[in-house]
Each structure stands twice: as structure tokens, then as C-alpha cells.
Amino acid sequence: ENEHALIDVREIKDFLIGQYLNNVSSEIVLFEKKTLSKSYMKFNDEGIFSSLSTEVDSNIFYFSYTNYVTPNQIYQYNALANTLKTIWIKNVPGFESEQYLSKKVFYPSKDGTLIPMFISHKKDQTINSNTPLLLYGYGGFDISILPSFSERYFAWMKMGGVVAVPNLRGGGEYGELWHQQGMLDNKQNVFDDFAAAAEYLHKNNYSQPTKTVISGRSNGGLLVGATFLQRPTLFGATLPAVGVMDM
């Protein structure tokens, strides 16, 4: 019914709730049971909904929300009245969401495929080729790398750095085809996507190779190791964690 990746389906009193991933941001679609007419839950920011809590005899449900510059929040939504209520906001000492920004861009990989990437930093910061850049990647096993708040990223941004997270092929962000395009004989696509992310950031004056550190864990550790070996002049430092380096 929908071209976007379906994450979850829930039932409430008068509606079915479809949770989709639309260009690496959550989308809640409400299907009215009697007519199957659909409506969208309105939300101003791009981020991720999770932990949906529903009851079949109520039109009210709860969910958590986060993105790269928004610590976890819990909301109540009334599907019948189309009203949203804030229940709880996580307090992170020293962090003020309005002082930071996160935006999504699309950049071309080596074969021309457009790859989404989130770039986050302080709003009032002057960004140029001397800005420290932390580039994180995974790209495998049908795992979607979704926008979420991280104290590690906050610390990096607070010290004046840029955080960039591309959604590489091999993940589940766009469904099974996206996954298959980054596995087995197509694994090189993932390394190319990661290198192209660095090239885009350098070309657009977010940083330079000597100021760029790449990070990844497990499959992301393999990604970091392989990409650095193939394109060593793109990076100043690497942080591979528990990567399978003999593949």
C-alpha cells in the first residue's frame, strides 16, 4: 500500500496505525477501520518514533521521539481528536536543543545512487575546512541507522565539531532492495557510499581530510577499515571497533 518501508502495525479502537520509514524519518499513518481512509499524524520535526504503546479499546496512544539534536521525549496522541500532548522530555545537563541543528542532505555515490546523510552541529558555529568532523557509518545486515540523540555526538558538537551520519546501502532504510545493494558481491557499494560521504563533506567545506575521523562498530568497524585502506587520503584518523578485518 505504501512505497516506504513498513516498521510496525498497531490496532487501536477506531484505527489501524502504520509506522513507516520515509527517507530515514518516521511517518505515522492512521487508517480508519470502517472506511480505510487514511490520515497522517502531523509532527514538525524529522526524527524517529518508537516504543508505541496502544490499547484496542482506546483511540489514545503513546510513543517516544528523538533525533540527533533532540533527547528522548514521550508524547500522547489522540487519533480521534488529532491532538498531541507532551508527557515527558529527557533532561541532558548542558544541552539546549535550540542551540543545535540537524539537516538531511542527499549526495551521489560513485555509481550515482543518491545517499541520505544527516549533518549536525551548533547553530551559531562557523563551519569551514578547519572544523573537526566525525563521520559514522554502518551499512549492513538490513539494520537501519536512525536519527537518535547521543551524548557522544553532543560532546563532539559542544566542542565545535560536526557529526555526519550517512545511511549507506546494506541497511534497511529503504527496504530489501537497499539491503541487497550493499551485501555479498555488492559490498563494495557500501565502501564507495562512505567514501563519497567524506568527499561531499569536504567539497562543501564542512571539513578537510586531516580533520576527519571515521567511526564504526562491528560491521561498521569493517567499513572503517576497508574504506581507509582503499581511500587513505580522505581521512585523518580512524576508530574501528570490533570489526571483522580479514574479510
Feature roles, as predicted:
Residues 18-19, 34, 39-40, 53, ...:
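Long, ordered, helix-rich scaffold segments
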Residues 44, 77-83, 88-213, 217-218, ...:
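Cap/lid segment of the alpha/beta-hydrolase catalytic domain
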Residues 2-19, 46-64, 103-104, 150-154:
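Conserved beta-propeller blade repeats
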Residues 28-30, 72-76, 84:
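Hydrophobic beta-strand positions in blades of beta-propellers and related beta-sheet-rich domains
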Residues 10, 17-24, 32, 62-69, ...:
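Beta-strand C-termini and the immediately following turn/loop, strongest in propeller blades
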Residues 6-10, 14-17, 28-33, 38, ...:
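C-terminal low-complexity, glycine/proline- and small-hydrophobic-enriched intrinsically disordered tails
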Residues 226-237, 243:
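Conserved hydrolase catalytic core segment
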